[in-house]
Amino acid sequence: MANSRRVSRVSSLIKREVSQMLLFDIKDDRVGAGMVSVTDVDLSGDLQHAKIFVSIYGTEEAKVETMEGLKSSEGYVRKELAQRIRLRRAPEVRFFEDHGIERGDKMLHLLNEIRETIPPEDESYNTED
């Protein structure tokens, strides 16, 4: 089993390489339907399984289409990782959509709505001392 520093280094290397593949190598038109970025790679301790989290900007239709394209390219990505990264065995790759940015945006929107409902002259909500 690899130590945590090695897992972290290999994860960041996989993230960089997959990002490059998304930009230049994966030719599936479905992947280009939405703007895709790799947000995180969760690598198992034995370096055999990689969960790749992606953020997709676009319509719901484009997101679904992009995820289908990514799922179909998992074998290609694994093969490319085996060639680009020196590991005994290339990890099994799975893509997952990361909804963190959407949730964060929704939370900011809700906080802004709450701020707008508080009257400006109300001193009870003033956080300055």
Swiss-Prot record:
Localization annotation: Cytoplasm
Cited Pfam families: RBFA
One annotated GO biological process: maturation of SSU-rRNA
PROSITE patterns tied to this protein: RBFA
GO CC terms in record: cytosol
Keyword Cytoplasm: yes
Major localization class: cytoplasm
Record flagged with keyword Cytoplasm: yes
Role noted for this protein: One of several proteins that assist in the late maturation steps of the functional core of the 30S ribosomal subunit. Associates with free 30S ribosomal subunits (but not with 30S subunits that are part of 70S ribosomes or polysomes). Required for efficient processing of 16S rRNA. May interact with the 5'-terminal helix region of 16S rRNA.
Family stated for the protein in its record: Belongs to the RbfA family.
Protein name, entry field: Ribosome-binding factor A
Organism: Crocosphaera subtropica (strain ATCC 51142 / BH68) (Cyanothece sp. (strain ATCC 51142))
Lineage of the organism: Bacteria, Bacillati, Cyanobacteriota, Cyanophyceae, Oscillatoriophycideae
